[in-house]
């Protein structure tokens, strides 16, 4: 790790003089800068010392440094609310309507493997029952559930209802603090599916456009347009979902700084 950091800071020092402005995140790469700051604090640094390290060693801007320290401190406070017997449950649905060119997740398209959805769901429901028994025997309690994939909403409303009923029937959700379903592709979202999710107690859904530029969406293998994203978002709001998160990816095929700015503005 030390060698990696040395290489990054060396490259940063060599390249930055030729840039129109220094990157606000300095030499940091990746998606979790707060993890770095948290590690510093847990190793004995004060928040102030960690901030100095971020600014002077990693060249992070003062504004981003303050944000990173706040995020690290918040995460550490949240950890204190998690009990020794609290666990999180992940349920994977490895099917998608199409495969995005950048995707590295384990997933199959419905065109290729749609016939496997029902037997997969049969097996998954049995695994849910067996896993719930192990959780009870260990004295654990589920405090968060995340159903991801793939795209869980490739299941139709009846299959979704079956899955959610299996979870509710076998797990104790009385301590549940967060229940999320990654709806993901707007072309798989319908009012009927949203009603099933809401009635089962799901509190948060993901609707992930990645881009709001139709040419970019076509280039990455998506089978929907930007209008479908807006439609799905409105339907989720109408179904009563107040917590909706959305993923965007910069630098996709055909994307430019201007088209990505338009995506963010949308």
Regions inferred by a protein language model and the residue ranges of each:
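N-terminal accessory interaction module
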Residues: 1-21
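N-terminal [4Fe-4S]-dependent radical SAM core
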Residues: 15-22, 42-89, 138-139
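N-terminal alpha-helical segment
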Residues: 30-33, 213
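Local cysteine-cluster metal-coordination motifs and their immediate loop/turn environment
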Residues: 92-107
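Conserved non-cysteine loop/helix-boundary elements of the Radical SAM core domain that shape
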Residues: 107-266
């Amino acid at each position: 790790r030390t060698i990696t950091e040395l290489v990054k800071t060396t490259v940063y020092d060599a390249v930055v003089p030729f840039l129109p402005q220094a990157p606000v995140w300095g030499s940091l790469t990746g998606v979790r800068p707060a993890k770095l700051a948290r590690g510093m604090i847990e190793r004995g640094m004060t928040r102030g010392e960690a901030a100095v390290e971020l600014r002077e060693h990693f060249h992070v801007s003062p504004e981003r440094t303050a944000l990173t320290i706040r995020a690290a401190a918040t995460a550490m406070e949240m950890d204190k609310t998690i009990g020794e017997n609290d666990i999180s449950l992940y349920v994977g649905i490895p099917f998608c309507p199409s495969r995005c060119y950048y995707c590295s997740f384990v997933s199959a398209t419905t065109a290729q493997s749609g016939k496997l959805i029902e037997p997969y769901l049969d097996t998954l429901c049995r695994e849910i029952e067996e896993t719930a028994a192990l959780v009870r025997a260990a004295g654990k309690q589920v405090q968060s559930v995340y159903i991801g994939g793939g795209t869980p909403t490739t299941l139709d409303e009846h299959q979704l209802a079956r899955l959610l009923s299996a979870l509710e029937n076998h797990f104790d959700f009385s301590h549940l603090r967060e229940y999320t379903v990654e709806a993901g592709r707007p072309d798989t979202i319908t009012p009927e599916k949203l009603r099933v999710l809401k009635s089962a107690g799901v509190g948060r859904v993901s609707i992930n456009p990645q881009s709001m530029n139709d040419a970019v969406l076509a280039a990455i293998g998506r089978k929907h347009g930007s209008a479908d994203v807006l439609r799905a978002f409105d339907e989720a709001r109408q179904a009563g979902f107040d917590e909706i998160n959305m993923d965007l990816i910069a630098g996709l095929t055909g994307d430019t700084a201007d088209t990505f700015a338009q995506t963010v503005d949308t």
